[in-house]
Amino acid sequence: MTTIVSVRRHNHVVIGGDGQVTLGNTVMKGNAKKVRRLHHDKVIAGFAGGTADAFTLFELFEAKLKLCSGQLTKAAVEMAKDWRTDRMLRRLEALLAVADETASLIITGNGDVIQPEDDLIAIGSGGPYAQASARALLENTNLSAREIVEKSLTIAGNICIYTNQYPTIEELKIKTKG
């Protein structure tokens, strides 16, 4: 598995993930990029789960974003509909965390689309550790979204054996209206 964490704070949304890929109890790769930019760099996304499955989902989600003119929530719902009804997709074992200027969402393997409380997402085997640390940092510090993601990934990596200390982090600056 892995750890993906997303935080939205002070006109920034950030998604970060570790770089470890395991096969059974063996580390196969330590610098995988599980977070990427999509749709003309307006959407950031991270995955937890099977690597091949996740790349398939990235491609499918990017196609949905294009079809839905970059509307994140609409694309996520359309993706979830396909995930629920397509036999091949139902066999894919992965979760996606996606965000743009307006929303942060989790797309599950069951075809659910979840907008979490406080725009905090943490998925994967290290997700509970990252979520707890990010929540504590959000509530008790003035750290930036990026700093919270970095520290949460470090904490998760110190606890979860399926999470390492080689993160990929992507950030979007949210344009304020006015």
From Swiss-Prot:
It catalyses: ATP-dependent cleavage of peptide bonds with broad specificity. It comes from the Bacteria. GO terms for molecular function: metal ion binding; threonine-type endopeptidase activity. Allosterically activated by HslU binding. Its main location: cytoplasm. GO terms for biological process: proteolysis involved in protein catabolic process. Keywords: Allosteric enzyme, Cytoplasm, Hydrolase, Metal-binding, Protease, Sodium, Threonine protease. Belongs to the peptidase T1B family. HslV subfamily. InterPro entries: ATP-dep_Prtase_HsIV_su, Ntn_hydrolases_N, Proteasome_sua/b, Proteasome_suB-type. Na(+) binds at residues 157, 160, 163. One of its GO terms (cellular component) is HslUV protease complex. The gene is hslV. This is ATP-dependent protease subunit HslV. The active site is at residue 2. PANTHER family: ATP-DEPENDENT PROTEASE SUBUNIT HSLV (PTHR32194:SF0), METALLOPROTEASE TLDD (PTHR32194). Its EC number is 3.4.25.2. It is found in: Cytoplasm. A double ring-shaped homohexamer of HslV is capped on each side by a ring-shaped HslU homohexamer. The assembly of the HslU/HslV complex is dependent on binding of ATP. Protease subunit of a proteasome-like degradation complex believed to be a general protein degrading machinery. CDD domains: protease_HslV.
